[in-house]
């Protein structure tokens, strides 16, 4: 184990602050409708141009080990917010920077970090409650389109397409984003089914960049038990290998020799195969396998029904036009099942929904129904160049996540106004000693997103904040038109979930950094010098060189 470097107290907090500032300053230029672009150099290919906070955050790596720790902690805020709420990454980064910057000052001035942390936590809890009070449910497709538009950096086409997709497949439906062949961004509704099981081995992956498996015109073997030996599988695999078609195996589990053999054959290219575990548990698993069989026109190979794995015939296999699998989900698109059988199944599930008394069962049955009926909406993103395509696709994915969040928890006025409207709650929150310092830190931090949006639009942030504070409700500063107006009427809205998560994640990481007393990093290795006693020039003395 190599030697370590240590930093304590003030020195450690200073390093963290430098790292936090380096990352946050790069990310926050992208905030708001007038936010700027960031160009990122790639080791191969053209540079990436982006206005997406989390993409910028993921690229920041600092030379100083201690400063880099600070930057990585804030990067965690951005990616966690992106993963859970789908948007709000830049806002979360700005809040984390503001809370930590103010907090570090107060700790340096002698405040107790633990008390400050408790104060921050209480303030955040109060703000979250108030955000939920301000929040309004999304009423119609128009509001959903507005959320999508804002999140896609004011691209109305994207907002409208997402709203249309949600209208077509419903809240429960599955929406995926793909690259289009042409220049236009369009929406395609595909009948398909998605379940939450990913590939059993990363060796099945066909697209290493995205870590996804894509099978075109595939066969599907549906088996309800575990497969561990190869003997029973061989007869059907040999027939499929001759046909040269891709195969997806869905079983309770595939392990040991069976999994190893499939992986080896996939790597050698003899079999184009992937395997996933069956979704659900117990009786629900049987029902879901039956759903998949009906959707794809296959049969569940189940010993209860008198089928044996070794006797499986090609006609027992399901078929689908396309199957996509990532590490968490499998989507079967355009199954070859008969329409009549599918309609019968849907009718049966609807009857069960009406009869069941358990809320949990009803929820699960509705999920199954959505998977059979809802289908999959595919948003095909078109662009002129590869660079533009990547940037646009990232925006569509952001916007999609934001709209989902809006449908889930409702909306609040956008443009940093919602945070300003929670300030009176913090004015009224009176705590003891250094806990009050924590509340004041959060109060100051909540003004930062609006300040930054105004600053990126070329305005004086503090003046804009004061003007917005004087008014109430959804009144705020619309940076796109540079007009003070009712944000909700102007269509500048944010999902409550995004606004809430950005603050919670920022405060959580910032208070962790505040209560850091010591940092440990690897000592960088000295650059190897020449051998001792070697004369300059590299030759040995007396060699007549």
From Swiss-Prot:
Pfam families reported for this sequence: Cpn60_TCP1
Gene Ontology, cellular component aspect: cytoplasm
Keyword Chaperone: yes
GO molecular function: ATP binding; ATP-dependent protein folding chaperone; isomerase activity; unfolded protein binding
Keyword field: ATP-binding, Chaperone, Cytoplasm, Isomerase, Nucleotide-binding
Isomerase among keywords: yes
Domain of life: Bacteria
Catalytic reaction annotation: ATP + H2O + a folded polypeptide = ADP + phosphate + an unfolded polypeptide
A biological-process GO annotation: protein refolding
Localization annotation: Cytoplasm
InterPro entries attached to this UniProt entry: Chaperonin_Cpn60_CS, Cpn60/GroEL, Cpn60/GroEL/TCP-1, GroEL-like_apical_dom_sf, GROEL-like_equatorial_sf, TCP-1-like_intermed_sf
Sequence similarity: Belongs to the chaperonin (HSP60) family.
Known partners and oligomeric status: Forms a cylinder of 14 subunits composed of two heptameric rings stacked back-to-back. Interacts with the co-chaperonin GroES.
Function: Together with its co-chaperonin GroES, plays an essential role in assisting protein folding. The GroEL-GroES system forms a nano-cage that allows encapsulation of the non-native substrate proteins and provides a physical environment optimized to promote and accelerate protein folding.
HAMAP family cross-referenced by the UniProt entry: CH60
Listed name of the protein: Chaperonin GroEL 2
Organism classification: Bacteria, Pseudomonadati, Thermodesulfobacteriota, Syntrophia, Syntrophales
């Amino acid at each position: 184990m190599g030697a370590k470097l240590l930093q304590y107290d003030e020195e450690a907090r200073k390093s963290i602050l430098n790292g936090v500032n380096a990352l946050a300053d790069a990310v926050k230029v992208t905030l708001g409708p007038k936010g700027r672009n960031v160009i990122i150099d790639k080791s191969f290919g053209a540079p990436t141009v982006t206005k997406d906070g989390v993409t910028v955050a993921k690229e920041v790596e600092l030379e100083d080990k201690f400063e880099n720790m600070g930057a990585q902690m804030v990067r965690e805020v951005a990616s966690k917010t992106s993963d859970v709420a789908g948007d709000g990454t830049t806002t979360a980064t700005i809040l984390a920077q503001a809370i930590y910057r103010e907090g570090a000052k107060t700790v340096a001035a002698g405040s107790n970090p633990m008390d400050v942390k408790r104060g921050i936590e209480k303030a955040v809890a109060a703000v979250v409650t108030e955000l939920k009070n301000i929040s309004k449910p999304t009423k119609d497709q128009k509001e959903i389109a507005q959320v999508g538009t804002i999140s896609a950096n004011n691209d109305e086409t994207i907002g409208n397409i997402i709203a249309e997709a949600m209208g077509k497949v419903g809240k429960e439906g599955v929406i995926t984003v793909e690259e289009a062949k042409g220049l236009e961004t369009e929406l395609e509704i595909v009948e398909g089914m998605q379940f939450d099981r990913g590939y059993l081995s990363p060796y099945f992956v066909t697209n290493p960049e995205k870590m996804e498996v894509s099978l075109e015109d595939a066969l599907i073997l549906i088996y309800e038990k575990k497969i561990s030996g190869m003997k029973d599988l061989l007869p059907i695999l040999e027939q499929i290998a001759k046909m040269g078609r891709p195969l997806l195996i869905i079983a309770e589990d595939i392990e040991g020799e069976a999994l190893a053999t499939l992986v080896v054959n996939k790597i050698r290219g003899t079999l184009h195969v992937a395997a996933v575990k069956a979704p659900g548990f117990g009786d629900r698993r049987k029902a879901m396998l039956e759903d998949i069989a009906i959707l794809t026109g296959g049969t569940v190979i189940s010993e209860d029904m008198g089928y044996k794995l070794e006797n499986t015939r090609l006609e027992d296999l399901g078929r689908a036009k396309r199957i996509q699998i990532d590490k968490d989900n499998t989507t079967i698109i355009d199954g070859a099942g008969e329409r009549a059988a599918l309609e019968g199944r849907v009718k049966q599930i609807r009857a069960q929904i009406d009869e069941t008394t358990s809320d949990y069962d009803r929820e699960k049955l509705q999920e199954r129904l959505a998977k059979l009926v809802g289908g999959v909406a595919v948003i095909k993103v078109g662009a002129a160049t590869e660079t533009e395509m990547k940037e646009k696709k990232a925006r569509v994915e952001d916007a999609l996540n934001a709209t989902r969040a809006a449908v889930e928890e409702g909306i609040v006025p956008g443009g940093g106004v919602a945070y300003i409207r929670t300030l009176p709650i913090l004015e009224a929150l009176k705590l003891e000693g250094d806990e009050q310092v924590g509340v004041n830190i959060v109060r100051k931090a909540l003004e930062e997103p609006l300040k930054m949006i105004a600053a990126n639009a070329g305005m004086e942030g503090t003046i804009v904040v004061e003007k917005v504070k004087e008014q109430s409700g959804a009144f705020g500063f619309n940076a796109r038109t540079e007009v003070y107006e009712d944000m909700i009427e102007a269509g500048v809205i944010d999902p409550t979930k995004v606004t809430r998560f950005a603050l919670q994640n920022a405060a959580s990481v910032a208070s962790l950094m505040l209560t850091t007393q010591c940092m440990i990093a690897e000592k960088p290795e000295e650059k190897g010098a020449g051998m001792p006693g070697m004369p300059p020039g590299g030759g040995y003395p007396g060699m007549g060189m």
